[in-house]
Amino acid sequence: VNQFEQRILQVTGAKAISNIETLQTLWGGYGALLRVSLDGGLYRSVITKQIDLPDFSEKEAHPRGWDTQLSHARKLKSYQVELTWYKEFASLCDENHKVPLCLDSACEGQSMMFILEDLAALGYPNALSLPTEAAIYAGLSWLASFHAHFMNVAPKGLWDEGTYWHLKTRPDELAVLQDQSLKQAANDIDLLLTKNKYQTLVHGDAKLANFCFSTSHQSAAAVDFQYVGRGCGMKDVALFLSSVLTFEETSQHVETYLKHYFRELTSSLEEFQPSLDAQDVVTTWMKLYPVAWADFQRFVKGWSPDHWKINPFTESLTEQAISLLPALKRELLLRR
């Protein structure tokens, strides 16, 4: 039994490890996610995230050519942020925004390891590559509860600005962006999202693949907290929808998803933030929904101009946001 396996046995009280399965390798060759099956002790299985931080020169090449010192530094910091999330914040989450608890973590030199609860063993066995209606609603309910709970919480040890695509962290993609009206609007879009008065913690990478679902898909739990930090909840909603829509839905259909999110947000705010005006949060964020989508579009169009997420639906939302910018700046930035 090696040192790593010994630690798992110690933390879980298991007698032996019966199987180790690689679930996935991490983006860019930074490590692996493993399911470790156990005999005896408190847990049938745990998930370990093992991260080996290479020097910049040793990394695997990015398939789109976006290999820069900045992207490498962002990735390294993201694992430190995730460590902080699991040590300081994960235990604050409740069943309505379920996350795995961290049973143990270790950081030595260029290597890090988290031992996490296995969500599959806790009633969330389903990872989906294609969404169901129930899963879409469950993911939005998770986000609403999470955003309400962490409203106005300081992102201590997390990203000062959550998400992996925000403007300050993506100068290279902005430089090559061909859409001039979006390029000119980028600063105002960013300003509205970061300076409106309702800031929460955002998951930062809330795509479908980062959720696990119950057998019925009625409830969700989330993983992968590398880009968690301060932000407007609409950023998570835009990214989540970008990962579940076919972009052939009617606008009324998408509207039902948004209504569901805002209904859940209202009831969660009443629970977690009774002193806040929930209706004002909803009104403000509703106006920022197209702005958050335009913000993501700015990244995608610079990063991969032929990406399938660039389509009439997302272009129309982006144009809508750009046309609303002057009025929204007057309304949302002056009344703080």
Label each PLM-derived region with a short phrase.
Residues 71, 84, 230-271, 292-311:
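Active-site activation/catalytic loop segments of kinase-like enzymes and analogous catalytic loops
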Residues 272-292:
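All-alpha amphipathic helical-bundle segments outside canonical DNA-binding/catalytic cores
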Residues 102-106, 153-166, 272-279:
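Short, glycine/acidic-rich hinge or "gate" loops at secondary-structure transitions
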Residues 122-203, 212-215:
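ATP-dependent phospho-/nucleotidyl transfer catalytic cores
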Residues 1-109, 214-220, 334-336:
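Conserved NTP-binding catalytic cores of kinases and kinase-like/nucleotidyltransferase enzymes
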Residues 111-122:
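Conserved short submotifs of the Hanks-type protein kinase catalytic core
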Residues 32-38, 42, 47, 189-235:
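Active-site acidic catalytic loop and adjacent metal/ATP-binding pocket
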Residues 286-336:
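ATP/Mg2+ or Mg2+-diphosphate-binding catalytic cores
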